[in-house]
C-alpha cells in the first residue's frame, strides 16, 4: 500500500462515495451516511444473488416487510431507489423496518479505511464537487465504476480487497 492507495474491498468504498454524493445532492452528513450504507448493502445483496451467494426472499415475505415499514418513501441515489423514513433526526434509510443509524456507519467506515478515511473522503468530495448536482446524480455510479478497487470476477472476488487509488479519484475531478 502506498500513501495514495488503500487496500480495501468495494462495499465501504461505495458506502463512502454514496454518502459524499448524497451530501452534494443536499442531504446532511448523517442522512447521507444512512443512505450510503443502504445503497452499498443493496448493491452487495444483488451481487450476492447474481453469484448465488444469497437467495432471494419469497415474494410474500418481501410484501410483509414492506407493509411493516410504516410511512416510508423512496430516495433515488446512484441509480437505486432506497427505502427511507423521516425520523426525528432527519432522513434515514431503512433495512427491514429498522432505520440505519449514522454513528454505526461512521464506525464502519473508520474500521475499514483506518487512518486513510479523511484523505479518501477529501478525494471523493473533490470529485463530487467537480459536478453540478444534477449531473452528479446522473453520472455518480459510472464515476464509482471508474475508481472502485479492481477485484477478481465472480465468487472468488466476493469480499476481496483491491487498491483504491486516491490519485485516480483526483484525476477524474480534474478531467471533468
Where are the regions that the model predicts?
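Solvent-exposed interaction surfaces and binding hotspots enriched for charged
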Residues: 1-176
Amino acid at each position: 500500500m502506498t500513501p495514495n492507495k488503500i487496500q480495501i474491498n468495494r462495499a465501504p468504498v461505495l458506502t463512502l462515495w454514496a454518502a459524499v454524493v448524497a451530501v452534494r445532492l443536499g442531504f446532511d452528513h448523517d442522512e447521507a451516511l444512512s443512505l450510503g450504507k443502504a445503497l452499498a448493502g443493496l448493491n452487495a445483496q444483488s451481487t450476492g444473488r447474481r453469484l448465488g451467494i444469497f437467495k432471494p426472499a419469497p415474494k410474500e415475505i418481501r410484501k410483509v416487510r414492506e407493509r411493516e415499514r410504516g410511512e416510508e418513501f423512496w430516495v433515488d441515489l446512484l441509480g437505486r431507489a432506497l427505502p427511507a423514513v423521516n425520523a426525528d433526526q432527519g432522513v434515514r434509510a431503512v433495512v427491514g423496518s429498522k432505520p440505519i443509524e449514522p454513528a454505526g456507519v461512521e464506525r464502519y467506515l473508520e474500521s475499514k479505511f483506518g487512518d486513510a478515511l479523511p484523505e479518501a473522503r477529501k478525494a471523493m468530495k473533490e470529485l463530487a464537487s467537480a459536478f453540478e448536482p444534477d449531473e452528479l446524480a446522473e453520472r455518480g455510479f459510472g464515476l464509482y465504476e471508474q475508481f472502485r478497487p479492481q477485484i477478481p470476477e465472480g465468487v472468488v472476488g466476493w469480499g476481496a480487497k483491491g487498491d483504491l487509488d486516491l490519485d485516480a479519484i483526483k484525476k477524474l475531478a480534474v478531467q471533468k
